[in-house]
């Protein structure tokens, strides 16, 4: 039941975010707020996350009940790696980042206030999309092993800093 609630909540969050991006992207230029324009790279990241999520959900649905989350996490990370190609080399902390985002998103489903659930989903997905978009911008088709390892170490250090500074409650509600 917990896994099903998590999948339903994350599916809905991705659907809403992708829909908002699509609607926002087709506004006439006169209505567009310059600071709020969504870069094409971020729209591509949302599509890649959505595709990876669908693959992982399909794989997890056929797994035994006790293994669903583990199968989902592994399939999601594998699909993200396959879809990011060279960008993944500079973003090697995806498994730990996505696992922490998944756990954070699941934690939000047990929060008592709906606004806390929404805030946690929004913050987690925004951070993941932004980080993936930035990694994709700096990725080169051919990278040396040393440069890729250095990028991964730097990124992992940044992820640890973000995780350490994350509050345990939002809006006075326990998350």
From Swiss-Prot:
Keywords: Allergen. Pfam families: Pollen_allerg_2 (PF01620). InterPro entries: Poa_pIX/Phl_pVI, Pollen_allergen/Os. The keyword Calcium does not apply. Coiled coil: none annotated. It comes from the Eukaryota. Belongs to the Poa p IX/Phl p VI allergen family. This is Major pollen allergen Pha a 5.4. It comes from Phalaris aquatica (Canary grass).
